[in-house]
Amino acid sequence: MLKFIIPTIMLMPLTWLSKNNLIWINSTAHSLLISFSSLLLLNQLNDNSLNYSLIFFSDPLSTPLLMLTMWLLPLMLMASQSHLIKEPPVRKKLYITMLIMLQALLIMTFTATELILFYIMFEATLIPTLIIITRWGNQTERLNAGLYFLFYTLIGSLPLLVALVYLQNTTGSLNFLLLQHWAKPLSASWSNIFMWLACMMAFLVKMPLYGLHLWLPKAHVEAPIAGSMVLAAVLLKLGGYGMLRITSMLNPLTEHMAYPFLMLSLWGMIMTSSICLRQTDLKSLIAYSSVSHMALVIAAILIQTPWSYMGATALMIAHGLTSSMLFCLANSNYERIHSRTMILARGLQVLLPLMATWWLLASLTNLALPPTINLVGELLVVMSVFSWSNPTILLMGANIVITALYTLYMLIMTQRGKHTHHINNIIPSFTREHALMALHIIPLLLLSLNPKIILGPLY
């Protein structure tokens, strides 16, 4: 595992010692090399996890998430270049250092064997993200957004620490690989119910569950482009990863406790999709759509069948690449028009025809068109939820229809229509942006050729 962590950490001195005109080239090129080295993780045995040492391991659940994390750093660096063009070199280097630090912490989160190490890294990812949002965000509301983000996640995850200390005292170990075999079946007593809530709440806030999701649109809208990308693509997946890991220790209580949360996520899925239809702000629309996609993942994880687990992991990876691409597209619009309001950015197909192609592809993957892995994930989730309870097909069907509606709305509002007076002279799209979109969409399409690598440990 050190072959990923040490090169990532060594990107920091590389950035600080680069000449001013080579900052972006050096950091992007070397982070791309690191992300290609992550392909080595795919070479795994079918029946077991790879234990690198006592503290790091990877199995078919954490491997795709790890690869997504490493793949995202060069993309974030590519996306941030024009955002930081007016900043002095020291601040550029500081920004890049924050992103690198975030990636190192995420790698350690996804590979930790020890639950306390997982918790510490899970909390530590908060710090660079918060600095990125509150320092480089666009409006002054970014401080408010940072406050929401900080307190929602901290209040959610404090009970988790208490629960972990309790687990350590009762079982004597917090190793994932041991606890799966040692954990005593939890009965439905009051203390166990609170224990279950304490374990799950941190991840439900991070996912976010409908009702605990208010920090997410705020943080997304105010964050700079790299902040939005890493928040949508990886930080939401931390919640899903933690839930998948910790539910195996909370049985059979989960079957008893999951009902309110299942209902909340299924209802919240419809609600957030409907909220998307009334959005004026482009980034806010994409943020709410990712809440509705993550609600599917919560429902799938709480049902706890092999199919739903496979659907949840597939949907997490697919959503990571898709929503990250949508945020990049929204940002490329924002850099030209300096407004996120959709009414002011109409008719861009005439002005930026190739960008319209990327918009179309991103929208189609967002509404889960057949060849993509989004469809694989959604089908598995819908089938497993249907076999858990038949009437849920109404909610699922409604959600799929509304998803198609708001995606179409987003596409038509940005690409079609009569363009407004103030965008007659905008900059053409750069090769860098096209490369960025291609690097998002190519992995999505390639994964649809062989989806079994992202179907998780139960495949």
Curated annotation (Swiss-Prot):
It catalyses: a ubiquinone + NADH + 5 H(+)(in) = a ubiquinol + NAD(+) + 4 H(+)(out). Keywords: Electron transport, Membrane, Mitochondrion, Mitochondrion inner membrane, NAD, Respiratory chain, Translocase, Transmembrane, Transmembrane helix, Transport, Ubiquinone. GO terms for biological process: electron transport coupled proton transport; mitochondrial electron transport, NADH to ubiquinone; mitochondrial respiratory chain complex I assembly. Pfam families: Oxidored_q5_N (PF01059), Proton_antipo_M (PF00361). GO terms for molecular function: NADH dehydrogenase (ubiquinone) activity; ubiquinone binding. The keyword Aminoacyl-tRNA synthetase does not apply. It is found in: Mitochondrion inner membrane. The keyword Transferase does not apply. Its main location: mitochondrion. The chain crosses the membrane at residues 22-42, 60-80, 92-112, 113-133, 147-167, 193-213, 224-244, 257-277, 284-303, 307-329, 350-370, 393-413, 435-455. It is a multi-pass membrane protein. Its EC number is 7.1.1.2. Belongs to the complex I subunit 4 family. Core subunit of respiratory chain NADH dehydrogenase (Complex I) which is composed of 45 different subunits. Core subunit of the mitochondrial membrane respiratory chain NADH dehydrogenase (Complex I) which catalyzes electron transfer from NADH through the respiratory chain, using ubiquinone as an electron acceptor. Essential for the catalytic activity and assembly of complex I. This is NADH-ubiquinone oxidoreductase chain 4. It comes from Balaenoptera musculus (Blue whale). The lineage of its organism: Eukaryota, Metazoa, Chordata, Craniata, Vertebrata. The gene is MT-ND4.
